[in-house]
Amino acid sequence: MADPSFDIVSKVDAQEIDNAVNQTVKEIRTRFDFRDTGASATLSGESILLVANTDERVKAVLDVLQEKFVKRGISLKALTFDEPKPSGKEFRLPVTVQQGIAEDKAKAIAKKIRTDGPKGVQAQIQGDQLRVTGKKRDDLQRVIQILKTEDFEVPLQFVNYR
């Protein structure tokens, strides 16, 4: 019989992202403080473009977007963005939705498992996810608890627990 294992992934449901952006657009259209500001939010692939006529309005649109993400159960750790940049008469803020675990974060997670995890538990980096194997399921559950207490700046999900 094979050793028990599970995968650590960082994925965000594309449909939930679409729903959150659509709800943001709907709220922008109905709110009085966004009238005549040219505020909009558009989704294209893994990125969301927020546009408004002032720096403050773009940040307000970002707040609305973050509120909708939280309501839909999407971790805000999956969003990356910079400061709004002027573009002609408007300000633009590109927001990127991270999918997968970056290599440097994966190495940090694997190191945490090696140093703080139970003996005999191994973590292997497989592209944008990690596979954790061990002799006992109790050890794997302990690893999950250890990782939940740490902040790796990416939302982690534990899947394929066998």
UniProtKB/Swiss-Prot annotation:
Query: Which molecular function GO terms apply here?
Result: nucleotide binding
Give the InterPro entries listed for this entry.
DUF520, UPF0234-like_C, UPF0234_N, YajQ-like_sf
Pfam families, per the entry:
DUF520
Report if keyword Nucleotide-binding is assigned. Answer: yes
GO cellular-component term (any)? cytosol
Top-rank taxon of the source lineage equals Bacteria
What UniProt keywords are attached to this protein's entry?
Nucleotide-binding
Gene3D superfamilies given in the database record: 3.30.70.860, YajQ-like, domain 2 (3.30.70.990)
Q: Does the keyword NAD apply?
A: no
> What family does this chain come from, according to its entry?
Belongs to the YajQ family.
Role played: Nucleotide-binding protein.
| Name of this protein | Nucleotide-binding protein Francci3_0558
